[in-house]
Design a protein with these regions (language model features):
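A short, sequence-level motif marking secondary-structure junctions
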Residues: 24-29, 45-53, 208-213
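A short, exposed loop/beta-hairpin motif centered on an aromatic-Gly-Thr core
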Residues: 109-115, 201-211
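Extended, polar beta-sheet/loop recognition surfaces of beta-rich domains
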Residues: 46-66, 165, 174, 225-258
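Surface-exposed loop/edge segments in extracytoplasmic proteins
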Residues: 39-42, 200-204
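Short helix-coil boundary/hinge micro-motifs
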Residues: 1-42, 58-90, 94, 110-113
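An aromatic-rich alpha-helical recognition segment common to small helix-rich domains
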Residues: 33, 123, 183, 193, ...
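Structure-specific nucleic-acid interaction/processing domains
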Residues: 18, 28-30, 34-42, 50-61, ...
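Short, cationic Gly/His-enriched loop motifs
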Residues: 76-98, 103-195
Length: 258
């Protein structure tokens, strides 16, 4: 009679590099695997999967080295198609932790995701409570309309907005170079002022000899456009999101170094 094998205590790294320890062995088809780094146990697994490193832990930061799926009801896909809230979560992490994207879009350098939002389950629950749609428009996750200059994606600072609203606050510092926002200096040293309207069209606002006068014209025009755009969404954006956006956008102050 052969001696029964007990592989309890056997260790191995999985394909992500996490340490695994067999904490219970009841034959090759029924083992429990402990992940000490995350204090989590995967139950009723096969020994062969352990040997091949194919056992995953839901707390491993597999998305841009930060985000993890966690445990809960929210899944990354359904019927082979990625869920909308998973795509939104991944895009948020990409903006904060993908160096290649930040080289193309420097405004995201220094941005972070709050600890809770690194957990896909928590983000997804927040998504379901706060996501809405405006017919015919693409929705985007914003972090700094409610709080100008904010660099952290968090539950209290983030809000979904139509792309038309979000585009009002896009910083195009790469395009304008060293010139202050809304203006460009011509060969004679004067300042030409242009500002996009609420539909993305760039309007010409004149030429001014001083930077201060040019900025004053741009600031007044831009702040008026911001108010007009949010007013146009009354009845289209549900409450309380509309009131929060309206308050923030009515109080938004354009600054020369934006």
């Amino acid at each position: 009679m052969s001696k029964k094998i007990d592989r309890t205590g056997e260790e191995k790294l999985n394909n992500f590099g996490s340490k695994m320890i067999i904490s219970r062995y009841n034959g090759a088809l029924d083992i429990d695997i402990y992940f000490p780094e995350y204090d989590w146990t995967s139950e009723n697994k096969k020994y062969q999967h352990f040997k091949n490193g194919k056992i995953n832990c839901p707390y491993e930061p597999r998305v841009y080295g930060k985000g993890y799926l966690g445990e809960g009801i929210y899944k990354k896909s359904k019927n082979g198609k990625l869920n909308k809230y998973y795509i939104s979560w991944c895009n948020m992490l990409k903006r904060c932790y993908d160096p290649k994207l930040q080289e193309k879009e420097p405004s995201y350098k220094g941005c972070e995701v709050e600890k809770e939002f690194l957990n896909f389950q928590i983000f997804s629950e927040w998504f379901y409570k706060n996501y809405y749609e405006v017919p015919g428009e693409r929705m985007e996750l914003d972090k700094d309309i409610l709080c100008k200059g904010n660099k952290i994606y968090s539950r209290d600072k983030c809000i979904f907005v139509p792309q038309r609203i979000n585009s009002l606050f896009v910083k195009r510092s790469n395009d304008r170079g060293k010139d202050p926002i809304g203006m460009s200096q011509n060969s004679e040293g004067n300042y030409r002022v242009r500002c996009r309207d609420g539909y993305g069209k760039r309007n010409y606002l004149g030429i001014y000899s001083s930077k201060e006068d040019a900025f004053r014209v741009y600031k007044e025009h831009k702040e008026r456009i911001i108010k007009e755009v949010i007013d146009s969404y009354e009845g289209k954006i549900p409450e309380p999101h509309y009131s929060r956006l309206r308050e923030a956008m009515y109080n938004y102050k354009v600054e020369m170094n934006d």
